[in-house]
Amino acid sequence: IMREYAEIGIGREARRTFDLEQLSIVPQRRTRSSKDVDTTWHIDAYTFDIPFLSHPTDALATPEFIIEMGKQGGLGVINAEGLWGRHEDLEGALARIYSQPGDNSIIQELHAAPLDDALLTERISQVRDSGVTVAVRVSPQNAREMAPKVIAAGAELLFIQGTLVSAEHVATGGEPLNLKEFIGSLDVPVIAGGVTDYTLSLIH
């Protein structure tokens, strides 16, 4: 996302935001042969052949999809707080969603089921046993509780992703989560998603 600033009053500025689909890549005068291009990328000690990560959404990230994406050189990301750990019949749960597109009540009902740590561990282990890199997403509000569980289950990369991720997450009645300190306490690489400012990225 790119931004530009506009004055909206005395001493006030607003940032205009552009989505990626609103942008176009302008080619340069010189092109380069695909044989000379290397698409591999690295996160810590992990190497991937293609620069693609999946969004950790239940509608997309089934165990089979995650495994196949890893085999093709990308990185599939598991949503630890989604349906994987809530419904043993995952295909049946997804079929209910597909049968009623746009009906949010079904999604809310399915996500209201309690999270089964043993089931989530079993499904993460299924991906780990396939030989692909295991990446798991948790939300900022549940990171402190969920991160140790998914790492123990086999997560090799941890994503902390929400609609908006800040340097410190505060909730009434709970202990504030300082992301810099929290990330430093973990033994796996961490990627923050939903970061809207490069200065926040530098903090981590």
Give residue spans per PLM region.
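Active-site entrance/lid segments in N-terminal catalytic domains of soluble metabolic enzymes
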Residues: 1-202
